[in-house]
């Protein structure tokens, strides 16, 4: 009975706290929505420019006119770009070139990458039977894409790799990320959105590199992409891992 009275007495205050929390979060949500809208607008404009460059100088005016005519229909806009640049590969090229340009114009729009240590030096030394006489060893183990991947979302790319040194000390490495669009038995490399290449200084052990790849709103269901992750250290040739994924409904 006492607990019930206490809950009844606290109810108005809890309601006030909850309302205050929502009000406090509201500006952050609005700011994020505003940033997303600005990024989307930038990408659309850059897509028009990229498409026009491929189709000829006079295409800018024509595409702009079509976009104005269909300004309320994003699906039609996407179809116009896709038709102008030539199918799935052309659309992907225009989109990722555009988004890379927009990231460079405003770096705050670019999703941050994350590097996380997943196994210690000693753990990995036992697992792979590493010997100090091997010197510096850097290997890309695997790439995973969190499913499902849908249009108008971000594909989470997790790349696992390890670096071993004779004494477990830190060493400099370079990671490289690549993105390809696959059509039939062919694939075409497109601009990787964000940091395609990044230098790191890491201690011996296993690491997981996480980045997010934006997927265009107008991407067709069934579109296939391949991501590639490379790691290089001590001037040696890079070690590579890759993963193919499909955009679903």
What feature does the model see in each segment?
Residues 199-203, 212-221, 234:
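Short, surface-exposed loop/turn segments at beta-strand-coil junctions that are enriched for proline
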Residues 230-241:
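Short acidic/polar inter-strand loop motif in beta-rich domains
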């Amino acid at each position: 009975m006492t607990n019930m009275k206490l809950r009844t007495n606290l109810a108005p205050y809890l309601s006030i706290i909850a309302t205050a929390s929502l009000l406090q979060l509201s500006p952050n949500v609005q700011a994020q929505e505003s940033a997303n809208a600005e990024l989307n607008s930038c990408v659309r404009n850059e897509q028009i420019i990229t498409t026009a460059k491929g189709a000829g100088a006079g295409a800018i005016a024509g595409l702009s006119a079509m976009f104005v005519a269909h300004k309320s229909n994003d699906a039609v806009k996407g179809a116009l770009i896709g038709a102008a640049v030539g199918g799935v590969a052309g659309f992907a090229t225009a989109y990722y070139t555009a988004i890379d340009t927009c990231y460079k114009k405003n770096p705050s729009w670019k999703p941050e990458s994350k590097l996380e240590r997943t196994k210690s030096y000693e753990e990995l030394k036992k697992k792979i039977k590493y010997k100090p006489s091997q010197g510096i060893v850097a290997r890309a183990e695997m790439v995973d894409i969190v499913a499902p991947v849908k249009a108008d979302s971000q594909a989470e790319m997790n790349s696992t790799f390890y670096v071993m040194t004779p004494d477990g000390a830190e060493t400099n490495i370079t990671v490289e990320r690549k993105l390809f669009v696959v059509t039939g038995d062919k694939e075409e490399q497109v601009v990787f959105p964000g940091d395609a290449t990044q230098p790191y200084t890491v201690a011996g052990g296993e690491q997981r590199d996480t980045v997010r790849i934006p997927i265009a709103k107008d991407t067709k269901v069934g579109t296939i992409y391949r991501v590639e992750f490379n790691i290089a250290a001590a001037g040696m040739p890079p070690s590579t891992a890759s993963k193919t994924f499909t955009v679903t409904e």
